[in-house]
Amino acid sequence: MAGHRLVLVLGDLHIPHRCNSLPAKFKKLLVPGKIQHILCTGNLCTKESYDYLKTLAGDVHIVRGDFDENLNYPEQKVVTVGQFKIGLIHGHQVIPWGDMASLALLQRQFDVDILISGHTHKFEAFEHENKFYINPGSATGAYNALETNIIPSFVLMDIQASTVVTYVYQLIGDDVKVERIEYKKS
């Protein structure tokens, strides 16, 4: 595993207001000591959730969601992992939510290879003009203003040299489904 960095990307937990906890099947997969970095798109919403993330990885980066109790989280953050500059934002600043042009503008402003945003509670990962965009969805499957039927999801990025292999974990019914997406830095 030399040269690999495992990055957990998740957000919109909304614990305890909309959900009690992460799905048990996700917790089983998230074992301490395997993950180097955590990038969280916010809306945890409490210190307990933060403390849980700290048990999984030493390096935890969080941006503030519109429901977070901790107002000290920054609005945005740029983190470098290996050869990749990664921008992190909650996503309520993106108007309309998840809008491609707005996301691309943020990507250029932050000057990043990968832009991670949340807020919509809907998983997405795609390449646009040689940059990579990820929305990890809601790790608990919390409802949002527009949608009550949300599939719980999180993302693991395996970063090695100039390649990121993104694994998306979705809890569909009782089964965890995994999808793999590869992005190479041009």
Curated annotation (Swiss-Prot):
Extract the InterPro entries matched here: Calcineurin-like_PHP_lpxH, Metallo-depent_PP-like, Phosphodiesterase_MJ0936/Vps29, Vps29
Q: Which residues carry this modification: N6-acetyllysine?
A: K54
Q: Name the GO terms of the biological process aspect.
A: endocytic recycling; intracellular protein transport; retrograde transport, endosome to Golgi
Q: Which GO terms describe its cellular component?
A: cytosol; early endosome; endosome; endosome membrane; late endosome; retromer complex
Q: Which GO terms describe its molecular function?
A: metal ion binding
Judging by the UniProt lineage, the source's domain of life is Eukaryota
**Record key words, sorted:** Acetylation, Cytoplasm, Endosome, Membrane, Metal-binding, Protein transport, Transport, Zinc
Q: What does this protein do?
A: Component of the commander complex that is essential for endosomal recycling of transmembrane cargos; the commander complex is composed of the CCC subcomplex and the retriever subcomplex. Component of the retriever complex, which is a heterotrimeric complex related to retromer cargo-selective complex (CSC) and essential for retromer-independent retrieval and recycling of numerous cargos such as integrin alpha-5/beta-1 (ITGA5:ITGB1). Component of the retromer cargo-selective complex (CSC).
Q: How does it assemble?
A: Component of the commander complex consisting of the CCC subcomplex and the retriever subcomplex. Component of the heterotrimeric retriever complex formed by VPS26C, VPS29 and VPS35L; within the complex interacts with VPS35L. Component of the heterotrimeric retromer cargo-selective complex (CSC), also described as vacuolar protein sorting subcomplex (VPS), formed by VPS26 (VPS26A or VPS26B), VPS29 and VPS35. The CSC has a highly elongated structure with VPS26 and VPS29 binding independently at opposite distal ends of VPS35 as central platform.
This chain's protein is named Vacuolar protein sorting-associated protein 29
State the species of origin.
Bos taurus (Bovine)
